[in-house]
Amino acid sequence: MSAITVGVVVFPGSNCDHDTAYALASFAGVKPVMLWHNNHDLQGAQAIVLPGGFSYGDYLRAGAIARFSPLMKEVVEFARKGYPVLGICNGFQVLLESGLLEGALSRNRDKKFLCCQTTITPVNCSTRFTEDYHQGEVLRIPIAHGEGNYFAPPEVLESLQEHNQIAFQYCNAQGEVTVEANPNGSLLNIAGIVNRAGNVLGLMPHPERASDAALGSVDGRLLFESLFRSLTGV
């Protein structure tokens, strides 16, 4: 079986691109390729990851400039054809700015940058990113962001719920979705959402930082396993 090629987009200011590539390369049969933002060539990628960082220094607002990168035209078309696209932290912000996902991410509730371990629970376990998870389980996955406060108008929130597009919610250690467990003020404790087709996922927690036992958690690893299983049919 030929290797699965996964493109990792590199913007000026990305700082989790190599972490993400390292996590991807830890899976047998997976070949990460770095995709510079100023190109148009996806290098035969079967999936795309927009990693965390501070693309273009987060000027204007997080992800606002990155959406205009030449490569993003290809990523948007790639996603609209039904191929999988994952946005992590700043990558989630870019997906929102690009219109591939609905809503917006604003400054954290307390206006402080947060870098800490969080617990989240899977809500929709039927997407190609989440099939290896189980509803109600508690995942330990860290966050590191200043603008992770998810906001959307009431009609968008209703639509997300109606179409099962909330992928992950912040929860406590018992798996309860509570105000106290919400680190940044996100509406409905939203930690990640998918598009209606289920092929585009954006989340603020960093699964690549929870994919190796040496990092204290492997709970993020199943997200990548789910994706690769969907690509290989195994």
Swiss-Prot record:
Transmembrane segments: none annotated. Keywords: ATP-binding, Cytoplasm, Glutamine amidotransferase, Hydrolase, Ligase, Nucleotide-binding, Purine biosynthesis. Its main location: cytoplasm. PROSITE patterns: GATASE_TYPE_1 (PS51273). GO terms for cellular component: cytoplasm. It catalyses: N(2)-formyl-N(1)-(5-phospho-beta-D-ribosyl)glycinamide + L-glutamine + ATP + H2O = 2-formamido-N(1)-(5-O-phospho-beta-D-ribosyl)acetamidine + L-glutamate + ADP + phosphate + H(+); L-glutamine + H2O = L-glutamate + NH4(+). Residues 6-234 form the Glutamine amidotransferase type-1 domain. GO terms for molecular function: ATP binding; glutaminase activity; phosphoribosylformylglycinamidine synthase activity. It is found in: Cytoplasm. Its EC number is 6.3.5.3, 3.5.1.2. The active site is at residues 89, 206, 208. Pfam families: GATase_5 (PF13507). Pathway: Purine metabolism; IMP biosynthesis via de novo pathway; 5-amino-1-(5-phospho-D-ribosyl)imidazole from N(2)-formyl-N(1)-(5-phospho-D-ribosyl)glycinamide: step 1/2. GO terms for biological process: 'de novo' IMP biosynthetic process. Part of the FGAM synthase complex composed of 1 PurL, 1 PurQ and 2 PurS subunits. Part of the phosphoribosylformylglycinamidine synthase complex involved in the purines biosynthetic pathway. Catalyzes the ATP-dependent conversion of formylglycinamide ribonucleotide (FGAR) and glutamine to yield formylglycinamidine ribonucleotide (FGAM) and glutamate. The FGAM synthase complex is composed of three subunits. PurQ produces an ammonia molecule by converting glutamine to glutamate. PurL transfers the ammonia molecule to FGAR to form FGAM in an ATP-dependent manner. This is Phosphoribosylformylglycinamidine synthase subunit PurQ. It comes from Chlorobium chlorochromatii (strain CaD3).
